[in-house]
């Protein structure tokens, strides 16, 4: 049986993923006059550059090309690749969209809106939708209907690890996904302001800074995936510290854009 606590924490994580981006853009619009158009440009940027383009490269490098697939088995190469690819695609995408589609939107509030849209769609796709599917699987396990989903070998291979996760993961860990999204959105807003500064002041060197900082933010998650960091809570503590620095920059950046 999947515990009630696990289901509750999954629901809370999903709620954070869906409601936080909406709450942020409503707040930013009411208090700072942020643009809904910029919010949706930020969301589109994540979808195109992270989900489609970066995702396509990952399929080729990690699955199709045998040489790179084998090379990525080494933790060092996988770590470097994973961290840098996210930074390159998302930050270059941010720069291009701001440069060509936000020519009249270079204010501090625009940076807030873009980051909320970018990080918001990321939260919905990564944590929100997965929380919903996991809750559905949890109810199926508890009602005894999960086995009916295992119609063939491929489905079993995909679903049995999910069943193991739901049954054996400590309940509190399901809440970490929602907490991580809070930190991630803060970082995405901070990076959006950094890239917008690069665009506004024609200082592309700050794009390089954003790529490196984005890569740094991804290091704890990659180390956890490879088993170098053993506890998920440790990852979230590190990520929260990075998010706190991002919030400090977000507040200070208001003067920079005046």
UniProtKB/Swiss-Prot annotation:
Instruction: Quote the InterPro entries the UniProt record gives.
Output: YhfC (IPR011397)
Transmembrane domains' residue ranges: 8-28, 38-58, 70-90, 121-141, 176-196, 204-224, 231-251
| Keywords attached to this entry | Cell membrane, Membrane, Transmembrane, Transmembrane helix
One GO cellular component assignment for this chain's record is:
plasma membrane
Q: Which Pfam families match?
A: YhfC
Q: Give compartment(s).
A: Cell membrane
Classify the protein's membrane topology as the record does. Answer: Multi-pass membrane protein
Return the protein name.
Uncharacterized membrane protein YhfC
- What is the taxonomic lineage of the source species? Bacteria, Bacillati, Bacillota, Bacilli, Bacillales
Name of the gene this protein is made from: yhfC
